Amino acid sequence: MEPEFPISVRFEDGEVEEYEDADDLIHNLEDFDSDTDTGCDVRDARGRRVRLKLKLLDLKELSLA
Protein backbone atom coordinates (compact mmCIF):
# COMPACT_ATOMS: atom_id res chain seq x y z
CA MET A 1 0.00 0.00 0.00
CA GLU A 2 1.04 3.54 -0.71
CA PRO A 3 0.77 6.55 1.60
CA GLU A 4 -2.25 8.74 0.93
CA PHE A 5 -1.99 12.50 0.51
CA PRO A 6 -2.01 14.93 2.15
CA ILE A 7 1.21 14.08 3.99
CA SER A 8 1.72 15.85 7.35
CA VAL A 9 5.13 16.55 8.86
CA ARG A 10 5.39 17.55 12.53
CA PHE A 11 8.77 19.16 13.14
CA GLU A 12 10.80 19.19 16.38
CA ASP A 13 9.45 22.61 17.34
CA GLY A 14 5.84 21.34 17.11
CA GLU A 15 5.06 23.07 13.82
CA VAL A 16 2.96 20.94 11.46
CA GLU A 17 3.01 21.33 7.68
CA GLU A 18 0.76 19.54 5.21
CA TYR A 19 1.75 18.64 1.65
CA GLU A 20 -0.91 17.97 -0.98
CA ASP A 21 1.17 15.96 -3.49
CA ALA A 22 4.70 14.84 -4.40
CA ASP A 23 5.52 18.14 -6.14
CA ASP A 24 4.51 20.03 -3.00
CA LEU A 25 6.87 17.85 -0.92
CA ILE A 26 9.77 18.27 -3.35
CA HIS A 27 9.49 22.04 -3.68
CA ASN A 28 8.96 22.79 0.00
CA LEU A 29 11.17 20.28 1.82
CA GLU A 30 14.04 19.99 -0.71
CA ASP A 31 16.31 17.88 1.54
CA PHE A 32 14.71 15.67 4.20
CA ASP A 33 15.11 12.16 5.64
CA SER A 34 12.53 10.90 8.13
CA ASP A 35 15.00 8.21 9.28
CA THR A 36 17.67 10.70 10.38
CA ASP A 37 15.42 13.65 11.33
CA THR A 38 14.30 11.76 14.43
CA GLY A 39 12.52 14.73 16.01
CA CYS A 40 10.05 14.82 13.12
CA ASP A 41 6.91 12.74 12.66
CA VAL A 42 5.58 12.07 9.14
CA ARG A 43 2.02 10.76 8.64
CA ASP A 44 -0.32 10.21 5.72
CA ALA A 45 -4.00 11.19 5.46
CA ARG A 46 -5.00 8.07 7.44
CA GLY A 47 -2.54 8.78 10.26
CA ARG A 48 -0.11 6.03 9.24
CA ARG A 49 3.64 6.57 9.73
CA VAL A 50 5.47 7.41 6.52
CA ARG A 51 9.12 7.04 5.50
CA LEU A 52 10.07 10.12 3.49
CA LYS A 53 13.43 10.81 1.85
CA LEU A 54 14.24 13.78 -0.37
CA LYS A 55 17.70 14.67 -1.60
CA LEU A 56 18.46 17.77 -3.64
CA LEU A 57 14.87 18.14 -4.89
CA ASP A 58 14.64 14.43 -5.79
CA LEU A 59 12.03 12.25 -4.07
CA LYS A 60 14.01 9.12 -3.15
CA GLU A 61 11.38 7.35 -1.02
CA LEU A 62 7.76 7.78 -0.02
CA SER A 63 6.41 4.64 1.64
CA LEU A 64 4.56 3.43 4.69
CA ALA A 65 6.96 2.90 7.59
Positions of predicted regions on the chain:
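A composition-driven surface/loop motif
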Residues: 4, 11, 30-36, 51
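Short, flexible N-terminal segments of the mature chain
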Residues: 15-41
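Low-complexity intrinsically disordered segments
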Residues: 34-65
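Short, extreme N-terminal segment that most often corresponds to the first beta-strand
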Residues: 1-19
